[in-house]
Amino acid sequence: MKLTYIAVLSLIVSLLSPLQLMGAETIEYDVKGLQADAEIRIDHWGVPHIYAQKHYDAFFVQGFNAARDRLWQIDLWRRRGLGELSEVLGPAFVEQDTAARLFLYRGSMFSEWLAYGSDAKRIAQAFTAGINAYVDLIDRQPDLLPLEFKLLGYQPSKWVASDPVRIRSNGLWRNVVTEVRRATIACEHGLQVDAIIKKLEPDWVTTVPLGLDPCDIPKDVLKLYSLSKAPVDFRLAVQFQPPSSKAQSNALPQVDHSRTLALLSDQLIDAGSNNWAVAPGKTNTGRPILANDPHRGHAVPSLRYIAHLVAPGINVIGAGEPGLPGISIGHNETIAFGLTIFSIDQEDLIVYDQRRKGNKYQYRYQDKWVDMKTHVDEIKVKGQKSVSVPLLFTRDGPVIYKNRKQAFAVRAAWLQPGMAPYFGSIEYMRAQNWDEFLAALNRWGAPAENQVYADTQGNIGYKPAGLTPIRTNYDGLLPVPGNGTYKWHGFYDMDQLPAQYNPKNGYVATANAMSLPKDYPYKEKIIGFEWANPWRINRIREVLESSSQHKMSTSIDLQRDYVSLPARRLLTQINISELPSPANALFSQWNYQLGKDSSAATLFEVWMNRHFTPMVIATVTGIDDPSALASLDNLSAIDEFEKFSDANKIQIVSDSILEAILDVEALMGADPMLWQW
């Protein structure tokens, strides 16, 4: 039987409101690539429910429908990830394309597919074939082409099965950025200052690796690294039009990417997530409740894409990403699953001595000069000739920066086989019980995740997952020399990460905070030391432990909970009546809720972030403007504040709150009733 025959794909668009049926429209498409007829039903929320008669047809239709709804978004995602923006947007994007190509997966595709499970390649083939089927449909019906393509003057590309897994730039990467920041602080002020600015957990004191001079790290060493995952700044396409003169056809513009990198910084602000699962014994239904709220920036179109896949062997609904097959957050008929980031340190910045010998670049490794590997990529450029770009690699990874004496490369676990971000969900979303779920997570690579679990039998569980490098003689918190002294000695088996199954307390919960058990041998098996502050997880635990009759509505309320634990901890140590007006009146009546119309919340947040925290850190470190070094940690600030004498506490509070009041008045006027957070 042929697998590629013309079948009918019925698209039923149900125009339902919550109150009444407005009507229904049925559209039929003739699509090559399906094994049997399939159907998409769109509910009143806009969620596609995909019904297929064959297992892999569900993924084909998922790809088709993702293209039908989000073609320009996923086409742009593919071009950005593969380094093909210049072909359609012009010469201003050559450097960003170069950066993206440095971080493509370039290893064995056999090993890559095998790492995800037995049918990963087949799923990717079906999904990308579905996307291509919609692109073919546009060729036959040009009126279906999304407006963005028309405005920018190009056509959507065809996909190959390897595209979604070769792209690694859509993950939430870890910790090269903080390594460089820490090196800068160590150079200018000493590591003792960094320990105050950001707490390390579990309790840890880092040291400068032998042979590293922190002052050798260039300020812009991470430009290509950051560009590789930066969003697309379309202003550059307008600003740098392809030259009209043939004599200039090979000239590339000098592009300032500061705005592009600022867009990336905006995306990463306050990134974080929460999840929890409550056991039947603590709910009012006698069944487990699982909740997950990933905190990613609002965007149009959205990062997430909700879908429901039904076919033999699969019935799963939830959220994934439009350019990937499967569901990463959701449930099937027997299990539910949700994720947050778990801070495994999966990166190192490697510093080499380097030289040029003839037409080769070399780096020093174990007292020998070793040739860098060179890949020459051809980047197509709109309106110009293609550009040949040499990409350099060491034994550790791609070279992102070099000067006359040194070269800098990134060693990253997520460049290993099986590490395409979120692609591993195709395995665990089909699990039917805890053991199958664990088995799937033991193959999960990136990004490192806290997974919570619940099933229809009443079980709950928690399992972190991600590829964890084995570091035996360093902690990964600073760049390291590339001379062979600081190596990874493979990776830990996934089952060595801690797990919980039906814990006695009746719930599991995570919020990006440090979640290693107290008896975990963190000094011998280093996972990472950089976690989110514990405010969110402490609030979640507080609520979940306060009742044995947890409801669905309790989880919904907790996802929208605005109680500020920093405010409660700090203000209970202060004599509020002695604060200047209007702080005394606002704080004395405040319930610590960060409501958008709360004048007290407005004043507190401006005070805490702009004045109190910088003033405390400046007092402890002696640095006039510590906020210029890094994002300051309010947990560290409160910890340090609590060590002050009573007189110093009064002085800090008095000075900083007065500055905050003036700041808010300048922003929103003198009437506190008009202050809004």
Model features per residue range: what roles?
Residues 25-289, 294, 318, 627:
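Substrate-recognition/specificity elements adjacent to catalytic centers across diverse enzyme folds
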Residues 187-193, 199, 203, 246, ...:
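Ordered core of a single globular domain
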